[in-house]
Amino acid sequence: MRLLLVRHGETDRNREGRVLGQGNQTLTEKGRKQAAAVAGALTEEGITTIYSSPLKRAVETAEMISDKLGLPVQVVDDLAEVDAGALDGMTSKDMRARYPDFMALWDRDPGSAVMPGGESLAHAQQRAWRSAQSFLDEHPDGTVVAVSHNFTIGTLVCKALELPLASFRHVRIDLGSVSIVELREGRNRVVLLNDRCHLVD
């Protein structure tokens, strides 16, 4: 299966440099343009199914792809961004001031750090991988697109490559980008990472 991983377009919190976990922000005008550009870039990929995180910013992006490809959007809860809990809406400076112990653990061992009032990155990775495996079971030879989020996509890529979870810090997933993972029984390959060629900044 070819799994095309699309990160949603820009929101106000992305622009402001604030944590956007499962907060339900909508796309900015720039974000809508990014989503439209992604949709245009995917027309020749032979996609048969569109999946999306349930969060508004992802669904909006997926709906633009849906309009372009003429395929319905199937919402999958496991594709949601990591639940950032009390950190949602904070800047990095805010987090370090209010949650110094958590941030120290996050810097040292992000896989074991549970976001205050939220979930761990390890749990988010587990559910993202579970969704990918369900897509593989249903479309073993197909091409599907999943619209999701920064941590969800980054940790899924690490899992596909059998990298430690902390390696997500070395995987950049920009807004409106496309990454492609080939999933086969016993063999996974990342064939495209963070492609932004379709975007005009």
Question: Which ranges hold each PLM region?
Answer:
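Phosphate-coordination/substrate-recognition cap region in phosphate-metabolizing enzymes
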Residues: 36-103
